UniProtKB/Swiss-Prot annotation:
<dbReference type="Pfam" id="PF00037">
    <property type="entry name" value="Fer4"/>
</dbReference>
<dbReference type="GO" id="GO:0016491">
    <property type="term" value="F:oxidoreductase activity"/>
</dbReference>
<keyword id="KW-0249">Electron transport</keyword>
<dbReference type="GO" id="GO:0051539">
    <property type="term" value="F:4 iron, 4 sulfur cluster binding"/>
</dbReference>
<feature type="binding site">
    <location>
        <position position="46"/>
    </location>
    <ligand>
        <name>[4Fe-4S] cluster 2</name>
    </ligand>
</feature>
<dbReference type="InterPro" id="IPR050572">
    <property type="entry name" value="Fe-S_Ferredoxin"/>
</dbReference>
<feature type="binding site">
    <location>
        <position position="23"/>
    </location>
    <ligand>
        <name>[4Fe-4S] cluster 1</name>
    </ligand>
</feature>
<feature type="binding site">
    <location>
        <position position="49"/>
    </location>
    <ligand>
        <name>[4Fe-4S] cluster 2</name>
    </ligand>
</feature>
<feature type="domain" description="4Fe-4S ferredoxin-type 1">
    <location>
        <begin position="8"/>
        <end position="36"/>
    </location>
</feature>
<feature type="domain" description="4Fe-4S ferredoxin-type 2">
    <location>
        <begin position="37"/>
        <end position="66"/>
    </location>
</feature>
<keyword id="KW-0004">4Fe-4S</keyword>
<dbReference type="GO" id="GO:0046872">
    <property type="term" value="F:metal ion binding"/>
</dbReference>
<feature type="binding site">
    <location>
        <position position="27"/>
    </location>
    <ligand>
        <name>[4Fe-4S] cluster 2</name>
    </ligand>
</feature>
<dbReference type="InterPro" id="IPR017900">
    <property type="entry name" value="4Fe4S_Fe_S_CS"/>
</dbReference>
<dbReference type="InterPro" id="IPR017896">
    <property type="entry name" value="4Fe4S_Fe-S-bd"/>
</dbReference>
<keyword id="KW-0408">Iron</keyword>
<protein>
    <recommendedName>
        <fullName>Probable ferredoxin TA0517</fullName>
    </recommendedName>
</protein>
Amino acid sequence: MVELKVKTEMDVDRNLCNYCGACVGMCPTDAIWLDETVIKIHEEKCIECGFCIVGCPTGAITAEWFHGNL
């Protein structure tokens, strides 16, 4: 049986992000990396654990699929 998983895009609010890198350190699959001016999320590597969302001190990362706290 094939399992299909629909992924929705994660959003990083550039006005809230202070580029501290906390999300990078929280990601267990190295799906997030920090450029000098941009947080990049590799959607194919993301396992939707929510660690980056909860670990962000400014609340800059959001996703439609994430509701609640870890």
